[in-house]
Curated annotation (Swiss-Prot):
Subunit architecture: Homodimer.
Disease involvement: Overexpression of SAT1 and the consequent putrescine accumulation might play a role in the pathogenesis of keratosis follicularis spinulosa decalvans.
Compartments it resides in: Cytoplasm, Cytosol
Native source organism of the sequence: Homo sapiens
Protein name, UniProt field: Diamine acetyltransferase 1
Segments forming a coiled coil: none
A GO BP annotation: angiogenesis
Residues covered by the N-acetyltransferase domain: 4-171
Catalytic activity: an alkane-alpha,omega-diamine + acetyl-CoA = an N-acetylalkane-alpha,omega-diamine + CoA + H(+); spermidine + acetyl-CoA = N(1)-acetylspermidine + CoA + H(+); spermine + acetyl-CoA = N(1)-acetylspermine + CoA + H(+)
Catalytic site positions: 140 (proton donor)
């Protein structure tokens, strides 16, 4: 592919971001779990206090998808803090459409994220990868990523909204 642009997402990109989130969820066999709306993305990412940041990969018109989409990849991230090592960039979602893989788009997105992390003086970038997703695991390992689950024995937990509400309202 001759050229593509990696740029910060704008509010106008929310429909494309949601489309790609759903494509990623389908790839991960979790499509039914996406309950987020375009309105949520708009309010949560482009309001006064954004909860996330996003980069998009855009291709020129001659490379648009058959459906007419110019946005073919994205990375959603936010900043967090580790009391042992300081600032972290947390990569929440990262996806390039299958027909656009192998052209350096994913590598360029990761390069841009690394530049953001360095500008913000982050200690590292953290993210999750499904155990079965060998292509992604290899993509990250080729770039120096280490698997904290196997190396340090960390386990990921979550508390769903119903239990948060229960704890928040206990007397």
């Amino acid at each position: 592919m001759a050229k593509f642009v990696i740029r910060p997402a704008t509010a106008a990109d929310c429909s494309d971001i949601l489309r790609l989130i759903k494509e990623l969820a389908k790839y991960e066999y979790m499509e039914e779990q996406v309950i987020l709306t375009e309105k949520d993305l708009l309010e949560d990412g482009f309001g006064e206090h954004p909860f996330y940041h996003c980069l998009v990969a855009e291709v020129p018109k001659e490379h648009w998808t058959p459906e007419g989409h110019s946005i073919v990849g994205f990375a959603m991230y936010y900043f967090t803090y580790d009391p042992w090592i300081g600032k972290l960039l947390y990569l929440e979602d990262f996806f390039v459409m299958s027909d656009y893989r192998g052209f350096g788009i994913g590598s360029e997105i990761l390069k841009n994220l690394s530049q953001v992390a360095m500008r913000c003086r982050c200690s590292s970038m953290h993210f999750l990868v499904a155990e079965w997703n060998e292509p992604s695991i290899n993509f990250y390992k080729r770039r120096g990523a280490s698997d904290l689950s196997s190396e340090e024995g960390w386990r990921l937990f979550k508390i769903d909204k119903e239990y948060l509400l229960k704890m928040a309202t206990e007397e």
